[in-house]
Amino acid sequence: MKDPYDVIKRHYVTEKAKMLEHLSAGTGEGKKKGSFCKDPKFVFIVSHDATKPLIAQALEAIYVDKNVKVKSVNTINVKPQPARMFRGRRKGKTSGFKKAIVTFYQGHSVG
């Protein structure tokens, strides 16, 4: 197995990712007041060649002190977006990345 820190690059923090965490925390800060899901979900940036089982093993190895168990992993490849650089004179692209939405069993969380 690869080094777990080569597979999991970092925690992904956006409004949608935080909304997923709040839904699993049961704080009711989702789209509908009082909405929640049973299992905690977190979003991570992962390596492009990472597979779902490899992501699950890496997270369980990184958070071995919290004794987490991964229930499921969903992955999304985000395509590079067009961008302009140097005051709009040159065209380029942002770098694409792969993100993983990881669902943990109820009672197990990394947060």
Curated annotation (Swiss-Prot):
Q: Does the keyword Nuclease feature in the UniProt annotation?
A: no
Q: Which residues constitute the signal peptide according to the record? A: none
GO CC, sorted alphabetically, is: ribonucleoprotein complex; ribosome
Instruction: List all membrane-crossing ranges.
Output: none
UniProt cross-references to Gene3D superfamilies, sorted A to Z? 3.30.70.330
Keywords of the record: Ribonucleoprotein, Ribosomal protein, RNA-binding, rRNA-binding
List the GO biological process terms.
translation
**Role noted for this protein:** One of the early assembly proteins it binds 23S rRNA. One of the proteins that surrounds the polypeptide exit tunnel on the outside of the ribosome. Forms the main docking site for trigger factor binding to the ribosome.
Q: How does it assemble?
A: Part of the 50S ribosomal subunit. Contacts protein L29, and trigger factor when it is bound to the ribosome.
- Family per similarity comment: Belongs to the universal ribosomal protein uL23 family.
Q: Write down what this protein is called.
A: Large ribosomal subunit protein uL23
Which organism's genome codes for this protein? Chlamydia pneumoniae (Chlamydophila pneumoniae)
